[in-house]
């Protein structure tokens, strides 16, 4: 049975283990646990930080524990003292990404009168700014048991609230935002396509009347 992200294997296992709070239990949980990076010991945080840089520089296909060890200037076994497997390290990266998005979503929920539109724009911008981490998070199978407890839930809760607790609407907005974002990252649109116009049209179609979510046909200044 593999350890969770940041959990050491063998002697001293659990020294870097994420703190388990109410996050895994209920809706209020994600807000009660520390941010992902704060749940690692300093050496594990350094590994995650450098791993993220390596991922963005070279992509997932070239990402390996050996390449990471080279960049850190250590031998691979040093990494395995903090992350039991490559899958555990990948899950740590994904957890950090979820919590970064969650913080942005939570801010939009309190600062925007069109929170669902604002969150969708944040989601797209996050993918553009972190393309390989985004692909890691959303374009491959997700090993949920390895995630830091509460990280995925924390990113989901603001979107559901922005959709007026309508989970179907929240899922539809996510599906649209992901489809546009991943196609854009993979250069699948014609070079002359007006993606901002398509984005506004798609978001408006989710709630043509404006509705309780505050979506409008005009979008939210994303062009």
Give, region by region, the residue ranges found by the protein language model.
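Basic, helix-initiating cap at the start of DNA-binding domains
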Residues: 1-58, 65-71, 88-91
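C-terminal regulatory/oligomerization modules of transcriptional regulators
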Residues: 1-29, 154, 179-187, 212-223
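Hydrophobic alpha-helical segments that form the core
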Residues: 3-6, 125, 166-188, 194-206, ...
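An amphipathic alpha-helix adjacent to DNA-recognition modules
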Residues: 41-52, 56, 61-62, 73, ...
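Key DNA-contact positions within bacterial/archaeal DNA-binding proteins
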Residues: 77-78
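Hydrophobic alpha-helical connector segments
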Residues: 92, 106-133, 151-156, 170-173
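Amphipathic alpha-helical segments used for helix-helix packing
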Residues: 124-146, 182-190
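Amphipathic alpha-helical packing segments from all-alpha helical-bundle domains
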Residues: 138-174, 193-208
């Amino acid at each position: 049975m593999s350890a969770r992200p940041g959990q050491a294997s063998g002697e001293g296992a659990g020294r870097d283990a994420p703190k388990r709070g109410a996050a895994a239990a209920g809706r209020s949980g994600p807000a009660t646990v520390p941010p992902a990076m704060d749940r690692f010991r300093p050496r594990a945080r350094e590994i995650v930080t450098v791993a993220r840089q390596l991922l963005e520089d070279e992509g997932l296909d070239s990402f390996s524990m050996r390449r990471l060890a080279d960049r850190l200037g250590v031998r691979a076994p040093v990494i395995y003292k903090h992350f039991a497997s490559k899958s555990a390290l990948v899950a740590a990266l994904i957890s950090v990404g979820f919590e970064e998005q969650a913080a942005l979503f939570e801010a939009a929920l309190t600062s925007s009168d069109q929170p669902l539109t604002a969150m969708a724009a944040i989601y797209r911008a996050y993918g553009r700014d972190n393309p390989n981490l985004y692909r890691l998070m959303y374009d491959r199978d997700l090993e949920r048991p390895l995630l830091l407890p509460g990280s995925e839930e924390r990113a989901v809760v603001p979107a559901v609230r922005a959709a007026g607790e309508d989970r179907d609407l929240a899922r539809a907005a996510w599906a649209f935002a992901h489809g546009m974002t991943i196609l854009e990252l993979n250069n699948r649109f014609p070079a002359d396509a007006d993606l901002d116009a398509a984005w506004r049209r798609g978001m408006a179609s989710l709630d043509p009347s404006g509705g309780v979510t505050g979506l409008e046909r005009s979008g939210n200044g994303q062009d």
